Amino acid sequence: MHPRFETAFAQLPAALQAALAPLIADTYFPAMLSAEQVADVRRQSGLDDDALAFALLPLAAACAQTEISHFNVGAVARGLSGNLYFGGNMEFRGAAMQQTIHAEQSAITHAWMRGETGLAAITVNYTPCGHCRQFMNELNSGLTLRINLPGRAPSQLGDYLPDAFGPRDLDIKTLIFDTENHGYALKGDALTQAAIAAANRSHAPYSQSPSGLAIETRDGEIFTGSYAENAAFNPSLPPLQAALNLMSLNGYAWADIKRVALAERDDATIVQRDATAATLKALGFTNLELVTLA
């Protein structure tokens, strides 16, 4: 078990501990449960979907990286597949505050990068901030996304975001979690191809500037991130954050980064390379490889 989970795990009910123990024993537990695993954990613990998501929040919050605020937020996203995806807020000391990943963004992007096609619900241990409410409005679930908070009846995103402005107001048809392929040809080695594939999946309808990023760890694992643009612009999530999020949730440290490749167009309206390099430098990594989409 990864050390970050030990304290939270010890506080779980005994039946839930017994059900989860073999699943999270690996140091590189991927911070998600498949639909089959969820069904088995529910059977052993006696918890329904919502109760299980609430019970898992301490484990999700344990994934947070909060060097600045020291305030851990956890989120658990339930995909249409029945899979559960953990998320935690992530802060990067030495980088701009805008590079922060919120817990809801973490869980949602985690599900997206795993190939999920939509969300049925998201459970959070604190009320979503306005930034996250706007971010969630870019999903294909729209204002109907179910939001579960401790001590409150389930609500929909529309209850938290009245008079919403979003992609539908701009006649955007393809949303986050919908199938997207920008059609750029794969080339180069495995890391380069992974970055291009991530760019092909990116959601960039406002700037028309798709981008993707791939991280290779020292043990040869590759984690990718796709750019997630937002109708309100500022809540957009860069591809580096999506990849760092996936890597961290899988139990890796920033020191495990071996190579990073960023794929974007030379003539892109929105340029990721400078902010990407600056954030990587804050994490102690300085060799960003650039890949031109063509």
From Swiss-Prot:
A GO molecular function held by the record: cytidine deaminase activity
Catalytic center residues: 104
Keywords: Hydrolase, Metal-binding, Zinc
GO cellular component: cytosol
PROSITE patterns registered for this protein in UniProt: CYT_DCMP_DEAMINASES_1, CYT_DCMP_DEAMINASES_2
Cited Pfam families: dCMP_cyt_deam_1, dCMP_cyt_deam_2
Names of required cofactors: Zn(2+)
Protein residues bound to Zn(2+): 102, 129, 132
Comment on bound cofactor: Binds 1 zinc ion.
Enzyme class, UniProt record, top EC level: hydrolase
Family: Belongs to the cytidine and deoxycytidylate deaminase family.
Protein name: Cytidine deaminase
Species assigned in the record: Cronobacter sakazakii (strain ATCC BAA-894) (Enterobacter sakazakii)
